[in-house]
Regions:
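Jelly-roll (double-stranded beta-helix
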Residues: 1-433
Length: 433
């Protein structure tokens, strides 16, 4: 996290006696990264956090990638993916590489345990649903369009609010009933290379780690943990820990969220995509101006509603471009994406490095003169190829790579009302020319 904060009760100095009301000492835990030289927080537990038992391996989490030798455009339609599992076991990895994994979760059950990802940072983007993330650092309320950044090692439980049975909220869930989407849906990113998901360094002061004036968001936009913080309960509490590409079960004889106070720079937080302030320009701006977070070898960007380019001859949609060094993945949240046709809410497009891509036929002329876009999308650019899983292939639109061929579309009108002709089936011969 970029700045220092604290919550709950703390002693005046670190590493000194801090006693409970019964006279016993609270148990101090330094919770940090990079071997004592990275961001850390210091927590004070009612019970020693080392008192665990009953450890066992539950299941493997290593994704199985397919079609690694096939390089083409991809379009996965996730809107109709069936509910599965809980907010952890229901996560379905769709694309990934050695640096980051990306997937969708539509849980059908509640978590009856707590979870710790000891393998990587998580960034969850909530598309539908509301709820509460209970963590060892306190409580985070979440709702639609929230990014939830959860640093590696955080113990938490993700609890969605119950939906009514009468269908009165179907409109808030893309028209889907409680049976079709019992709790909600979120997009998930997880680091696979032990790096951390952080704001881009160029947004931050090198002297103070404060957000700079040119940054599209700042500290005021971040929601940090709040009370309730401490759960002082006895019993058997399962904590599942992801590490070594497996999930392991441990048993605590007390509630794992027994922290009475903490301070530091390492903690989870929420950021709503509507609080991202887009940067606009006279001519079309490149994707890096939409960057929101980054990890090693990947970035996460937010394409938000905004004013379009204001040069009198501007073309307000992206130009054709080649991803020479990166793959580009877009998750479409809502609104109209002017450069694409056939895209729907919940679509995920993958444009691999080495293949030029850009506006679909006819969309450039159609965009001329537009002053505003209502698109909302989350993008992940990776600097190593992203590969699909079987789950992604099952929902893949195989016709998508051909969608740039103009003869696959009805002609569009240009600004003068004339139809754009379809290309000839074959090139003209010298006699025909």
């Amino acid at each position: 996290m970029p700045y220092y904060t604290k919550l709950g009760n703390l002693p005046r100095k670190r590493h000194v006696q801090f006693r409970r009301p019964d006279g016993a000492l609270y148990s101090e835990e330094l919770f940090g990264t990079e071997g004592f030289v990275g961001p850390t927080s210091t927590l004070y537990h009612i019970h020693p956090p080392t008192q665990v038992s009953g450890w066992k391996n539950l299941y493997t989490t290593k994704p199985e990638y397919v079609e690694s030798g096939v390089m083409r455009m991809r379009h996965a339609k996730t809107a109709d993916m069936k509910p599965k599992g809980d907010p952890v076991t229901g996560r379905i990895v769709l694309y990934g590489n050695a640096d980051v994994e990306m997937g969708i979760c539509t849980p059908e059950a509640a978590m009856d345990y707590h979870f710790k990802n000891g393998q990587g940072d998580e960034c969850l983007f909530v598309h539908y649903g509301t709820g509460t993330l209970f963590t060892m650092f306190g409580t985070l309320k979440f709702g639609p369009k929230d990014y939830i950044v959860i640093p590696k090692g955080t113990i938490y439980q993700m609890v969605f609010d119950e939906r009514p049975d009468d269908g009165s909220d179907n409109e808030k869930f893309a028209g889907k009933s409680k049976a079709e989407m019992p709790y909600g849906r979120f997009l998930c990113f997880e680091t696979a290379n032990a790096s951390h998901i952080l704001p881009p360094p160029r947004y931050m002061s090198k002297q103070t780690a404060q957000f700079l004036e040119h940054a599209p968001y700042c500290e005021r936009d971040l929601r940090i943990p709040e009370p309730p913080l401490t759960f002082d309960e006895a019993g058997e509490f399962e904590v599942r820990i992801k590490a070594r590409d497996s999930v392991h079960s441990y048993i605590y004889n007390y509630h794992p969220l027994d922290v009475v106070g903490w301070d530091g720079c390492y903690y989870p937080y929420c950021f709503n995509i509507d609080d991202f302030a887009p940067i606009v320009g006279q001519l079309h701006m490149p994707p890096p101006i939409h960057q929101t977070f980054e990890g090693h070898n990947f970035v996460i960007c937010s394409f938000c509603p905004r004013m379009l380019d204001f040069h009198p001859e501007a073309i307000p949609i992206p130009y054709n471009h080649s991803n020479i060094d990166s793959d580009e993945i877009l998750y479409y949240v809502e609104g109209d994406y002017g450069a694409r046709r056939g895209i729907e809410i919940g679509s995920i497009s993958l444009h691999p490095q080495g293949i030029p891509h850009g506006p679909h036929p006819g969309t450039v002329e159609k965009s001329l003169g537009k002053k505003y876009t209502n698109e909302l999308a989350v993008m992940c650019d990776t600097f190593r190829p992203m590969f699909p899983t079987k789950a992604a292939v099952q929902i893949d639109d195989e016709s998508y790579p051909e969608s740039w061929r103009q003869d696959h579309h009805a002609p569009l009108e240009n600004r003068n009302g004339a139809h754009q002709p379809k290309p000839s089936a074959a090139p003209a011969t010298p006699d025909q020319a």
